[in-house]
Amino acid sequence: MSPIPHIEGVLSADEVVQTAESIASLQLDTGMIPWFPGGHCDPWNHVETAMALDVAGLHGPAERAYEWLVDIQLPDGSWWNYYLPDGSVEEAKLDTNVCAYIATGVWHHWLCTWDRAFVDHLWPTVQRSLDWVLSMRKPNGTPLWACTADERPWDYALLTGSSSISHALKCGAQLAELINEP
């Protein structure tokens, strides 16, 4: 396991842990971590919060966060854009960047915990998400930003979203190599 990061004179390890504990206090029994009490959650920011929990050594809550994503993943490998605490969908858009990011989070979890069994458990979810993202490419390979709930793709891509997808694909490739997946 990694030591708690800190920046001398700016942010102490205790402050990092306190921040992570405040994030963990928002976590629902389902594993969802809303933006604020009673607020919504999107899978991209949800992965970011799980990564923050891992950095602070709160691996149990981080794993519960990933389990929530396993539980709510759609059959095609995607996730809706925003969820509410009651489990309902607030925004039924499918965003490629949001769906790809779990690969980044699971790779980060591996680097923080070296828990191969958890990686093995999450791999099918990661693989389905990346397969869905790759199905959303233009003929030149550029990943489209999103599609509507009725599966009509938007006709453009975002630089920031595509950059995040590129990073997630690299993390997914590293995960596949780790578990000897072709």
Describe the predicted segments one by one.
Residues M1-G9, V47-P61, Y101-F118, S164-E181:
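Well-ordered alpha-helical scaffold segments within catalytic/enzyme domains
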Residues M1-W44, V55-W79, N140:
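Low-complexity, Ser/Thr/Pro/Gly-enriched N-terminal "stalk/linker" regions
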Residues E21, L28-G39, N81-Y83, E90-A100, ...:
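The feature captures the catalytic groove of carbohydrate-active enzymes
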Residues L26, A52, I72, G105, ...:
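Generic structural signal for bulky hydrophobic/aromatic residues embedded
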Residues H59, R128-S129:
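Glycine-rich loops and low-complexity Gly/Arg-rich segments
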Residues R64, H121-P124, R128:
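Primarily a tetratricopeptide repeat
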Residues L69-G87, C99-T104:
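A short glycine/small-residue-enriched secondary-structure motif
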